């Protein structure tokens, strides 16, 4: 919808108390960009991208891979000026994710509800739903990869190498720490002091494939989807 701050996208028709300005919410924003980038009118998502980093939006209220989303919008509309304008803000956003949600393990943690997944089995096993989740860690890997690509586009080659190194390191951590070898599946490690995998195989365990994180032999995780 058109607002005084330009076009925004909302998933709600009635106003809801958990949404932000103009009834926006960052929870599904990545999906909005991936689907909306095919719209012929590029102004809609260009405005929407700027909205999140204009001071009006709250891009970290929920898990939201903003750099990845905006980079994939760029691949369709080739709006280099938008990338150049938002790059410093996307860098700052990623740095804040690192500051707020990454700890000494090198992994990111998130609350299941803030992942946009309501209450979960793995969240029930932790303190306040917190855990090292394949979701947020995959999103942050995607952010680092996207920032590396954006940095190259705006001629920041040294920064591109820095972000690619961050991505490579996180990819290794995801594959070592969040892959349950007994279950052949990516799982949540609930934040409850035990550093043990949740007993549940949750659909979120397939999210790393969206970002091409798993090695080929991890494809065994898909076997149960086709096991009649």
Locations of regions flagged by a protein language model:
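Short, functionally important structural connectors and interaction interfaces within domains
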Residues: 69, 74, 128, 193-195, ...
């Amino acid at each position: 919808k058109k607002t005084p701050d330009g076009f925004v996208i909302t998933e709600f028709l009635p106003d809801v108390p958990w949404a932000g300005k103009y009834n926006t919410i960052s929870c599904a924003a990545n999906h909005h960009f991936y689907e909306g980038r095919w719209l012929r009118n590029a102004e809609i998502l260009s405005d929407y991208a700027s909205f999140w980093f204009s001071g009006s939006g709250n891009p970290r209220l929920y898990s939201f891979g903003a750099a990845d989303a905006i980079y994939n919008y760029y691949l369709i509309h080739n709006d280099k000026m938008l990338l150049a304008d938002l790059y410093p803000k996307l860098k700052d956003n990623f740095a804040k994710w690192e500051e707020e949600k990454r700890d000494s393990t090198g992994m990111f943690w998130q609350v299941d509800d803030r992942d946009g997944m309501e209450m979960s089995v793995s969240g029930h096993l932790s303190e306040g739903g917190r855990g090292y989740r394949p979701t947020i860690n995959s999103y942050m890997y995607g952010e680092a990869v996207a920032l590396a690509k954006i940095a190259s586009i705006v001629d920041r080659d040294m920064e591109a190498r820095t972000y690619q190194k961050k991505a490579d390191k996180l990819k290794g951590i995801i594959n070592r720490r969040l892959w349950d070898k007994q279950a052949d599946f990516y799982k949540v490690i609930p934040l409850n002091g035990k550093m043990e995998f949740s007993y549940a195989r949750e659909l979120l365990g397939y999210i790393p494939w969206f970002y091409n994180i798993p090695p080929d032999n991890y494809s065994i995780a898909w076997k149960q989807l086709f096991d009649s």
